[in-house]
UniProtKB/Swiss-Prot annotation:
<dbReference type="GO" id="GO:0003723">
    <property type="term" value="F:RNA binding"/>
</dbReference>
<dbReference type="InterPro" id="IPR047575">
    <property type="entry name" value="Sm"/>
</dbReference>
<comment type="subunit">
    <text>Homohexamer.</text>
</comment>
<keyword id="KW-0694">RNA-binding</keyword>
<comment type="similarity">
    <text>Belongs to the Hfq family.</text>
</comment>
<keyword id="KW-0346">Stress response</keyword>
<feature type="domain" description="Sm">
    <location>
        <begin position="10"/>
        <end position="69"/>
    </location>
</feature>
<protein>
    <recommendedName>
        <fullName>RNA-binding protein Hfq</fullName>
    </recommendedName>
</protein>
<dbReference type="GO" id="GO:0043487">
    <property type="term" value="P:regulation of RNA stability"/>
</dbReference>
<dbReference type="InterPro" id="IPR010920">
    <property type="entry name" value="LSM_dom_sf"/>
</dbReference>
<dbReference type="GO" id="GO:0006355">
    <property type="term" value="P:regulation of DNA-templated transcription"/>
</dbReference>
<dbReference type="GO" id="GO:0005829">
    <property type="term" value="C:cytosol"/>
</dbReference>
<dbReference type="Pfam" id="PF17209">
    <property type="entry name" value="Hfq"/>
</dbReference>
<dbReference type="GO" id="GO:0045974">
    <property type="term" value="P:regulation of translation, ncRNA-mediated"/>
</dbReference>
<comment type="function">
    <text>RNA chaperone that binds small regulatory RNA (sRNAs) and mRNAs to facilitate mRNA translational regulation in response to envelope stress, environmental stress and changes in metabolite concentrations. Also binds with high specificity to tRNAs.</text>
</comment>
<dbReference type="InterPro" id="IPR005001">
    <property type="entry name" value="Hfq"/>
</dbReference>
């Protein structure tokens, strides 16, 4: 994945992680996972509920926060 794609992903996921916002993650096969984002990198998201699951980003369709989240992508992303 290019850096440009991560200019949006990283601040969004980081805001969800820092604010401990519960999320629903829908996979491409339709399965719904729920929990809190513990950590993430370029390829995976660690989702914590009763256990911690490693979810590969290529399997994720949608991330839905339980409440609105304020996040600010890098200023460079809006000027490029």
């Amino acid at each position: 994945m290019s850096n440009k794609g991560q200019l949006l992903q990283d601040p969004f996921l980081n805001a969800l992680r820092k604010e401990h916002v519960p999320v629903s993650i829908y996979l491409v096969n339709g399965i719904k996972l729920q929990g809190n984002i513990e950590s993430f990198d370029q390829y995976v998201v660690l989702l914590r509920n009763t256990v911690t699951q490693m979810v590969y980003k290529h399997a994720i369709s949608t991330v839905v926060p339980a409440r609105p989240v304020n996040f600010h992508p890098d200023a460079e992303a809006t000027t490029s």
